[in-house]
């Protein structure tokens, strides 16, 4: 039977999706299922790994039924996933020994403080390209081994397996036959040396994590194994692509050349710039990470993570009840005319790149009796664009590359006002693609390259198409005046303390 589709499994923080893509890279079907969030203590976020698997199985079944697709028409499966989230399970039973600790969770911050006080920061930075932070997987694994009775000893005996979500999905889909991850996910664990491309003995010793529990690290595009027959009506389908969500979006945006960059505007913002075969060490508060490993070659990226972006609009809607639906924010922002000197620094969980300050709170500046709801909404929407400029400034400083255009994706980029303001404040064109689902598309492309569904990156690059191009049209004096106000607001926010 002719292979007509590639299936992407996009396992996210709040939901799992299964998506079919045809040879033109267009969406041919989608199914989505949300799952529960677990908050055992303030600042802790966990998931039930079994519930994640159930959501994935359900979306696959729904997709095949709704699209009336024969499993034999699927060339391969690409997996993309919420990064850093850590699962530890029993190899014999396949049962998790604890919940998955989610990337957002701050429950390992005390471990991070101890590691910093012990003087490990520079070593971690040099080997992994990361900072010591509760965000990354390494301290999460250590926490589980520290807090589950007998876990570390069992791990040393080879009885337990660790994996990021991609590893967990593949283990289950293959019936426990395959324990792998790819370069992109390994590079987010704080245990992987991104230069030597191996699990690092010094990092493992620092965290007291036994090497026996770690997955094999493979390329981002190859056949890792076959699914068990029960998931695809008696058929086996090759699992052939893996990438963490942000790297998958970079690939889905066809940012294949050094200096090309994308920004994903979701709950937070994640901006990645391709730096080719150079692992550029950041001096400006960014992360150095692996973009992907394909064709026997690893390529790198600089990454800036902004913790609060689209979620500020959700907060205005749900917390302050300023409007009924998120899309209303565009009309409110446009009605305001300008920001009237109001700046909103949405540091609800601190500030991410390039500041990395988890100890500060959000703030609003410049309020007068004349400040309206519209000004407030506009300032909140503008904050996404200002934070992106902070990251881009750091990227250009680190890489020595001046950005020619920014490829944008994610829910918030549907807001035309935000997209235009972003272009204005960066003084760079912002391109919104025709296919908005770039994360799932990137995973599909990686799988399709491995199975021969697509022939090359050149073929993929030709498929990438612009929905709308936003050109900068703000006078330079006004642009710099607005950005200077933002910088003052950030500085004031960082100086504010609650005793």
Swiss-Prot record:
Which GO terms fall under molecular function for this chain's record? ATP binding; glycerol kinase activity
An example Gene Ontology CC term for this record: cytosol
Catalytic activity as recorded in UniProt: glycerol + ATP = sn-glycerol 3-phosphate + ADP + H(+)
* Cross-referenced InterPro entries: ATPase_NBD, Carb_kinase_FGGY, Carb_kinase_FGGY_CS, FGGY_C, FGGY_N, Glycerol_kin
Q: Which residues bind sn-glycerol 3-phosphate?
A: 13, 83-84, 135, 245
Binding residue positions for glycerol: 83-84, 135, 245-246
Q: What is its EC number?
A: 2.7.1.30
Q: Name one GO biological process term.
A: glycerol metabolic process
**Which pathway does the database say it acts in?**
Polyol metabolism; glycerol degradation via glycerol kinase pathway; sn-glycerol 3-phosphate from glycerol: step 1/1
Keyword terms, alphabetized: ATP-binding, Glycerol metabolism, Kinase, Nucleotide-binding, Transferase
Residues that, per the record, bind ATP: 13-15, 267, 310, 314, 411
Q: Which HAMAP family match?
A: Glycerol_kin (MF_00186)
NCBIfam families on file: glycerol_kin, PRK00047.1
What family does the entry list?
Belongs to the FGGY kinase family.
The name this protein carries in UniProt is Glycerol kinase
Which taxonomic lineage does the organism of this UniProt entry have? Bacteria, Pseudomonadati, Pseudomonadota, Gammaproteobacteria, Lysobacterales
């Amino acid at each position: 039977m002719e292979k007509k589709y590639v299936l992407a499994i996009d396992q996210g923080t709040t939901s799992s999706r299964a998506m079919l893509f045809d040879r033109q890279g267009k969406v041919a079907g989608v199914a989505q299922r949300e799952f529960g969030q677990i908050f055992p203590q303030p600042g802790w976020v966990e998931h039930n790994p079994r519930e994640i698997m159930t959501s994935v199985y359900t979306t696959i079944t729904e997709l095949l039924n709704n699209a009336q697709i024969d499993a034999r028409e699927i060339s391969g499966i690409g997996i993309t996933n919420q990064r850093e989230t850590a699962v530890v399970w029993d190899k014999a039973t396949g049962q998790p020994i604890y919940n998955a600790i989610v990337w957002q969770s701050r429950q390992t911050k005390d471990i991070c403080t101890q590691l910093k006080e012990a003087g490990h920061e520079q070593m971690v930075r040099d080997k992994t390209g990361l900072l010591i932070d509760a965000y990354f997987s390494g301290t999460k694994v250590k926490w589980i081994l520290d807090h589950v009775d007998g876990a570390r000893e069992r791990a040393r005996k080879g009885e337990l397996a660790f994996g990021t979500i991609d590893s967990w999905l593949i283990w289950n889909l293959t019936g426990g036959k395959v324990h792998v991850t790819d370069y992109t996910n390994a590079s987010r664990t704080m245990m992987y040396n991104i230069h030597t491309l191996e699990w690092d003995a010094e990092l493992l010793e620092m965290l007291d994590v036994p090497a026996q529990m770690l997955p094999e690290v493979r390329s981002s595009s190859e056949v890792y194994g076959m699914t068990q027959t029960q998931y695809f009506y008696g058929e086996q389908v090759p699992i052939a692509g893996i990438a963490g969500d942000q790297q998958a979006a970079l690939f889905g945006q066809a940012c294949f050349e050094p200096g090309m960059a994308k920004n994903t505007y979701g709950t937070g913002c994640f901006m990645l710039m391709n730096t080719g075969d150079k692992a550029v060490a950041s001096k400006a508060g960014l992360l150095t990470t692996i973009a992907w490993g394909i064709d026997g070659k690893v390529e790198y990226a600089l990454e800036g993570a902004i913790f609060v972006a689209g979620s500020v609009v959700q907060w205005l809607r749900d917390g302050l009840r300023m409007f009924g639906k998120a899309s209303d924010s565009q009309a409110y922002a446009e009605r305001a005319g300008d920001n009237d000197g109001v700046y909103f620094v949405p540091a609800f969980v601190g500030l991410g790149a390039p500041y990395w300050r988890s100890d500060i709170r959000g703030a609003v500046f410049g309020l007068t009796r004349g400040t309206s709801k519209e000004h407030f909404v506009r300032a909140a929407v503008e904050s996404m664009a200002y934070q992106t400029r902070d990251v881009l400034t750091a990227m250009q400083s680190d890489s020595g590359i001046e950005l020619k255009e920014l490829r944008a994706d994610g829910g918030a980029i549907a807001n035309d006002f935000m997209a235009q303001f972003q272009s204005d404040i960066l003084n760079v064109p912002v391109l919104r693609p025709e296919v908005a689902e770039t994360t799932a598309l990137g995973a599909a492309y990686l799988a399709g390259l491995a199975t021969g569904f697509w022939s090359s990156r050149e073929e993929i690059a030709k498929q990438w198409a612009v929905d709308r191009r936003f050109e900068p049209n703000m006078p330079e004096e006004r642009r710099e005046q607005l950005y200077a106000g933002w910088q003052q607001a950030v500085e004031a926010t960082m100086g504010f303390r609650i005793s």
